[in-house]
């Protein structure tokens, strides 16, 4: 039973965008993102953009796949021939490296979700493109110094709108050989029910409800 789902999106400092005189579109392009990053980049106080740079499939490659997609690239062609040396891949990687080199924080190659979350909550990131779950943390005044200055937009586009954001899902299952199958099944049913969702929302707020089930 699915209990959690997320996508990716743009999270940005609306106060900095307003100060720069830039209105962020609901569906921005990567050209828009680069222009805004240049305007609000003010190190060491604020870095124009923060992106995952730590190597790994669940790290920078999760993000890079969406960037390559929007440049019109793909991992394989229809004959399963790798496309890593194609022009869209080269364009996307060059854009990514230049963006972080010019407008990202120092040490970006070691940053993944948790490192960037800490930077964002300290007010060090002007923009961040990452998992939608981050909204729960960066809008929480108990965790974030800029909770009241955050705005959101869809994943940036470039040559195409296809694949501009990712989609992940997690699910609960009961193993066939479990000794307490009935109890486990009842728990899974409850933990994925509207009753559970409303209970969490009432107890601790909608921001703590599993993503993909929020109002």
Predicted regions: what they are:
Residues 1-3, 8, 32-82, 125:
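Extracytoplasmic/periplasmic solute-binding protein
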Residues 1-16, 47, 152-157, 161-165:
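A structural signal for short loop-to-beta-strand junctions that line the ligand-binding cleft
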Residues 15-25, 43, 74-75, 101-102, ...:
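Short helix-loop capping/hinge motifs at secondary-structure junctions, enriched
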Residues 26, 53-56, 71-91, 140-145, ...:
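Short, solvent-exposed loop/beta-turn-alpha elements that line the ligand-binding surface or hinge
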Residues 28-35, 107-122:
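Short helix-initiation/N-cap motifs at beta->coil->alpha
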Residues 36-41, 79-110, 155:
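Glycine-centered hinge/linker elements that transmit conformational signals in sensory
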Residues 126-131:
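Paired acidic/hydrophobic, glycine-rich loop segments that form the ligand-binding mouth/hinge
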Residues 133-147, 158-215:
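C-terminal lobe and pocket-closing loops
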């Amino acid at each position: 039973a699915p209990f959690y789902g997320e996508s990716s999106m743009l999270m940005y400092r609306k106060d900095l965008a307003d100060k720069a005189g830039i209105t962020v579109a609901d569906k921005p392009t990567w050209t828009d993102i680069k222009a805004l990053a240049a305007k609000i980049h003010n190190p060491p106080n604020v870095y124009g953009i923060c992106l995952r740079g730590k190597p790994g499939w669940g790290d920078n490659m999760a993000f890079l796949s969406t960037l390559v997609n929007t440049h019109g690239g793909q991992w394989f062609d229809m004959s399963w021939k790798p496309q890593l040396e194609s022009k869209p891949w080269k364009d996307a990687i060059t854009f990514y490296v230049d963006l972080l080199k010019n407008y990202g924080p120092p040490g970006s190659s070691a940053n993944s979700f948790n490192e960037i979350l800490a930077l964002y909550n300290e007010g060090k990131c002007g923009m961040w493109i990452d998992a939608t779950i981050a909204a729960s943390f960066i809008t929480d005044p108990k965790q974030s110094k800029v909770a009241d200055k955050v705005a959101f937009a869809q994943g940036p586009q470039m040559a195409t709108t296809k694949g501009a954001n990712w989609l992940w899902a997690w699910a609960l299952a009961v193993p066939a050989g479990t000794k307490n199958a009935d109890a486990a099944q009842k728990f899974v049913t409850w933990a994925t029910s509207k009753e559970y969702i409303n209970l969490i929302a009432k107890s601790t707020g909608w921001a703590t409800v599993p993503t993909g089930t929020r109002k």
